[in-house]
Design a protein with these regions (language model features):
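Beta-strand/loop substructures that line and gate deep hydrophobic ligand-binding cavities in soluble
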Residues: 114-141
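Terminal, regulation- and interaction-focused segments at domain boundaries
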Residues: 29-62, 164
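Extracytoplasmic/secreted envelope proteins and their assembly/folding machinery
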Residues: 48-55, 72, 152, 156
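C-terminal partner/receptor-binding element of secreted or periplasmic proteins
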Residues: 131-164
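Bacterial N-terminal signal peptides that target proteins for export
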Residues: 2-14
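Second-shell loop/turn segments in exported
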Residues: 37-45, 85, 137-145
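Compact, glycine-rich, soluble single-domain proteins
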Residues: 55, 59-115
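Bacterial N-terminal signal peptides
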Residues: 13-23
Length: 164
């Protein structure tokens, strides 16, 4: 009888442990802004127009468009179609030098990204980015914080100009 109770207890404990491990995964939902400092601007601009206006705003605000990556372009290359989706990576050499002088490990954060997504239901696009201060905050470095505060103003202006 002791063995029977013990066996049931072990099975119960195993099932309970498994349930607790699986419960968070089953209850998870997509979090649109999982990081602090994430800004999303819904626009009435079509995807292509927002891509163009963001590139122009980056240039007008004297920042560099370091690179672009597009899942939409990648999907098209294999014969698939998905809603507009592009990341534009932005920085500038003088900020890179200051960043690396303050913290070499922080170099992984640059360039800072703008993310454009198309709403297939409306055809309108959204612009999302993380404020530079939130990107660099985890490094707890006064020089990075000062630089990030300058970049916050520039990135907010780029976003504002792009969505006009």
């Amino acid at each position: 009888m002791t063995r029977g109770i013990h066996g049931r207890w072990v099975r119960f404990a195993a099932i309970a442990a498994l349930s607790m491990m699986l419960a968070p995964a089953a209850g998870r939902a997509d979090v649109p802004a999982p990081y602090p400092g994430t800004k999303t601007i819904e626009t009435s601009k079509p995807y292509g127009a927002l891509v163009q206006s963001l590139a122009a705003a980056i240039k007008a605000n004297k920042m560099g468009l370091v690179s672009k990556a597009s899942a939409t372009v990648g999907a098209k290359s294999i014969g698939k179609t998905i809603p507009g989706n592009m990341v534009l990576m932005v920085f500038r050499p003088d900020f890179a030098i200051r960043m690396l002088k303050a913290s070499v490990p922080a170099g992984i954060e640059a360039p800072i990204r703008f993310y454009i997504t198309e709403n297939p239901a409306t055809g309108n696009a959204s612009l999302t980015y993380r404020t530079p201060s939130s990107v660099f905050n985890p490094y707890r470095n006064a020089e990075l914080d000062a630089m990030a505060a300058e970049l916050d103003v520039i990135f907010a202006k780029i976003a504002s100009d792009a969505v006009k």
